[in-house]
């Protein structure tokens, strides 16, 4: 069932066929094994940012350490980015194909306090922050917390 919040998230990621999954891995210098392709396909199927536990639930035949190692590899090669949404569990989301996870590529994330889903809002830029002399940002985590479109329709 499609929902308003899920639709916003899905519009940001174009559907891919098998060759596109392979190309996406190769473009990030990741060897496309059957397991990595399975994990990437599963990630692309989520309508929100996902946790390691979410992947475990979807891929119950793959052990947790393999999933964790694959996520770590995908993070290192900028295939996914990590999101600290304040829940204590790191979430992940697929990067767009032109993302290098540099400061200019950053976008806002939204955490719904009602349904506890986290969404990438790729069209919403992270606000510019002026830093004092001598300070330089390496990463920025900008999370808005509130009620998503799905949950606000239920209230």
Question: What is each residue range found by the language model?
Answer:
Residues 24, 41-46:
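Short amphipathic alpha-helical elements of helix-turn-helix/winged-helix folds
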Residues 32-34, 46-51:
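Short capping segments at the starts of secondary-structure elements
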Residues 1-12:
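Single conserved hydrophobic/aromatic residue that forms the stacking wall/gate
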Residues 67-77:
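Basic amphipathic alpha-helical segments that dock to polyanions
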Residues 76-155:
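Non-DNA-binding regulatory cores of transcription-related proteins
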Residues 15-37:
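Short alpha-helical segments that sit at the start of domains
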Residues 54-58:
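A short acidic, leucine-rich amphipathic alpha-helix
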């Amino acid at each position: 069932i499609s929902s308003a919040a899920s639709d916003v998230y899905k519009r940001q990621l174009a559907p891919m066929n098998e060759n596109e999954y392979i190309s996406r891995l190769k473009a990030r210098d990741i060897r496309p094994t059957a397991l990595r392709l399975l994990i990437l396909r599963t990630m692309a199927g989520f309508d929100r940012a996902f946790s390691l536990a979410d992947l475990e639930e979807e891929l119950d035949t793959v052990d947790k350490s393999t999933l964790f190692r694959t996520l770590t590899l995908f993070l290192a090669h900028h295939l996914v980015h990590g999101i600290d949404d304040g829940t204590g569990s790191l979430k992940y989301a697929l990067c767009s194909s032109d993302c290098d996870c540099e400061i200019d590529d950053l976008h806002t994330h939204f955490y719904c306090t009602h349904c506890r889903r986290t969404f990438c809002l790729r069209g919403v830029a992270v606000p510019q922050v002026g830093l004092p002399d001598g300070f330089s940002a390496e990463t920025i985590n900008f999370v808005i917390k509130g009620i998503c479109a799905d949950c606000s329709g239920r209230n």
